[in-house]
């Protein structure tokens, strides 16, 4: 795969309209995310031809350039450096461009509702992506600790060293989840246009304790809010609601606040308003929403058909860049079950891609371009990074993308069926890698080995069905050159 270079980023910047057309540059695990002032200036066809670019996705004013794992952060750093240097400015808009821009605006108006949803959900990438490496690290360490515990502690006479090692490996996950709400509150309020620290403070209201007799946690110093009982329910849903609404309140307060008093009073007024709203409205409503979301997805996950639908449609959400919208559901399931039972179901979608791509490889002749593409993308796909296969192999050919979704649905059906029969499995953390890398992170009510076995079974079924469906039904009239 091509290396991210300064020259490559300068080329990308030129093709999106120059530095003057980039309002914001960020990234997720695999994508460079550019918020453009005028999306009509971006040359999608030319961007896709750049060596190292695996695909381009547009979500309203945000252009997402797929670069692959380990490269998006480097690309974002280089891009921001180029923008700050001011070496590349946006080209002037000529009269010839006006018809193109008008057509683009018409297209945006027609898809206003869809774009608004996409725009909202895409912000979840900004909230949760910086936390994903921590989720993965804590999950892997917890998986290793649980494995050691099963082998050397349960039913054994463990050494002091082994007990200390297990406790040490688990402590990072406990630390992450103890204060995770504060991190999410910070990122959420910042993502929606407010000050991150205000979001963190509002999120801390859900972490503090309100029972003076409690022996655990940090007592807030108050047990009621002006006569109203305080029940810090809602968990991540409540935190997100408080931070998102808090950002809107902060922006509105700032509109009316004199510049000289902005730094001193804007946050004060915002916190006073949002503290009351959080205690009186958001905590009760967030609690009910949290329970409802948990109930819905627990029932979907325990239903083979529901699990198949979720797994089969997940790749479509990846294509539109809105798959981060599932993250709040992950939190709800962690709270309800102690593990994330939705994640292994959705992970089957990537396995279906692997099976479909292997079928295309088998059908294609030697020394063809598609074989070269698959060779470069299949290992990341097996390891859980599916975007190279999606944008480089299956999606451009359409039929294999559909049969890959069928393969994912088959694996999802299997995991849902096992759950329906009484053995739900899930990830031991909120978010983690998919593919074979996720195997040691799997757990269940019957222990980690049962969880790992069910997950591997689902992967094998998705590989097999994705391969068979593509080999027999997904290759006709498809470019295999």
UniProtKB/Swiss-Prot annotation:
Residues covered by the PTS EIIB type-1 domain: 1-89
GO cellular component: plasma membrane
Gene Ontology biological-process annotations: phosphoenolpyruvate-dependent sugar phosphotransferase system
Known EC number: 2.7.1.192
Pfam families named among the record's database cross-references: PTS_EIIB, PTS_EIIC
Keywords on record: Cell inner membrane, Cell membrane, Kinase, Membrane, Phosphotransferase system, Sugar transport, Transferase, Transmembrane, Transmembrane helix, Transport
Lineage top rank: taxon: Bacteria
InterPro entries: Glu_permease_IIB (IPR036878), PTrfase_EIIB_Cys (IPR018113), PTS_EIIC (IPR003352), PTS_EIIC_1 (IPR013013), PTS_IIB_1 (IPR001996), PTS_Sugar-Specific_Components (IPR050558)
Membrane topology: Multi-pass membrane protein
Keyword Membrane: yes
Domain (PTS EIIC type-1): residue spans on this chain: 122-481
Primary subcellular site in the record, as a coarse category: membrane
GO molecular function: kinase activity; protein-N(PI)-phosphohistidine-sugar phosphotransferase activity; protein-phosphocysteine-N-acetylmuramate phosphotransferase system transporter activity
Reaction equation(s) it catalyzes: N-acetyl-beta-D-muramate(out) + N(pros)-phospho-L-histidyl-[protein] = N-acetyl-beta-D-muramate 6-phosphate(in) + L-histidyl-[protein]
Broad EC category: transferase
Subcellular location: Cell inner membrane
TM region positions: 124-144, 165-185, 190-210, 225-245, 263-283, 307-327, 342-362, 376-396, 406-426, 448-468
Active site (catalytic residues): 28
Stated role: The phosphoenolpyruvate-dependent sugar phosphotransferase system (sugar PTS), a major carbohydrate active transport system, catalyzes the phosphorylation of incoming sugar substrates concomitantly with their translocation across the cell membrane. This system is involved in N-acetylmuramic acid (MurNAc) transport, yielding cytoplasmic MurNAc-6-P. Is also able to take up anhydro-N-acetylmuramic acid (anhMurNAc), but cannot phosphorylate the carbon 6, probably because of the 1,6-anhydro ring.
Domain topic, free-text comment: The EIIB domain is phosphorylated by phospho-EIIA on a cysteinyl or histidyl residue, depending on the transported sugar. Then, it transfers the phosphoryl group to the sugar substrate concomitantly with the sugar uptake processed by the EIIC domain. The EIIC domain forms the PTS system translocation channel and contains the specific substrate-binding site.
Name this polypeptide is given: PTS system N-acetylmuramic acid-specific EIIBC component
Organism of derivation: Vibrio cholerae serotype O1 (strain ATCC 39315 / El Tor Inaba N16961)
Upper classification of the organism: Bacteria, Pseudomonadati, Pseudomonadota, Gammaproteobacteria, Vibrionales
């Amino acid at each position: 795969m091509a290396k991210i270079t300064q020259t490559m980023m300068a080329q990308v910047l030129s093709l999106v309209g120059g530095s003057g057309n980039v309002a914001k540059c960020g990234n997720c695990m695999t994508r460079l995310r550019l918020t453009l002032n005028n999306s009509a200036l971006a040359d999608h066809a030319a961007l896709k031809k750049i060596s190292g670019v695996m695909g381009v996705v547009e979500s309203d004013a945000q252009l997402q350039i797929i670069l692959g794992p380990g490269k998006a952060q480097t690309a974002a750093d280089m891009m921001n450096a180029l923008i700050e240097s001011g070496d590349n400015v946006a080209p002037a808009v000529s009269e010839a461009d006006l018809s193109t821009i008008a057509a683009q605006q018409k297209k945006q108006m027609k898809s206003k509702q869809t774009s608004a949803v996409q725009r909202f959900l895409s912000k979840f990438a900004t909230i949760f992506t910086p936390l994903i490496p921590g989720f993965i690290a804590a999950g892997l360490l917890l998986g290793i600790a649980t494995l050691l515990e099963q082998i050397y502690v349960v039913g054994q006479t463990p050494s002091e060293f082994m007990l200390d090692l297990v406790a040490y490996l688990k402590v990072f996950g406990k630390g992450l989840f103890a204060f995770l709400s504060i991190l999410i509150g910070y990122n959420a309020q910042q993502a929606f246009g407010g000050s991150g620290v205000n979001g963190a403070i509002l999120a801390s209201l859900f972490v503090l304790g309100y029972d003076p007799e409690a022996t655990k946690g940090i007592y807030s110093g108050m047990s009621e809010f002006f006569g109203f009982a305080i029940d810090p329910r809602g968990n991540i849903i409540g935190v997100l609601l408080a931070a998102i609404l808090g950002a809107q309140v902060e922006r509105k307060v700032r509109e009316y606040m004199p510049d000289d008093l902005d730094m001193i009073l804007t946050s004060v007024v915002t916190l006073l308003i949002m503290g009351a709203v959080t205690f009186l409205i958001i905590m009760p409503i967030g609690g009910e929403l949290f329970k409802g979301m948990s109930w819905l997805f627990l029932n979907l996950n325990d239903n083979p058909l529901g699990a198949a639908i979720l797994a089969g449609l997940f790749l479509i959400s990846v294509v539109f860049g809105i798959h981060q919208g599932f993250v709040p559901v992950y939190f709800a399931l962690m709270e309800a079950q102690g593990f994330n039972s939705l994640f292994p179901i959705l992970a089957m979608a990537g396995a279906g891609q692997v099976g479909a791509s292997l079928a295309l490889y088998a059908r294609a002749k030697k020394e063809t371009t598609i074989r070269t593409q698959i060779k470069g993308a299949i290992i990341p796909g097996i390891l859980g990074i599916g975007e190279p296969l999606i944008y480089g192999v299956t999606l451009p050919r359409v039929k294999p993308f559909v049969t890959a979704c069928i393969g994912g649905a088959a694996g999802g059906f299997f995991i849902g069926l096992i759950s329906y029969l009484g053995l739900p499995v899930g990830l031991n953390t909120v978010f983690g890698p998919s593919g074979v890398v996720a195997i040691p992170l799997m757990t269940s009510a019957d222990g980690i080995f049962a969880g790992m076995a069910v997950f591997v079974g689902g992967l094998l079924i998705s590989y097999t069905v994705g391969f068979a469906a593509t080999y027999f039904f997904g290759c006709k009239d498809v470019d295999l050159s």
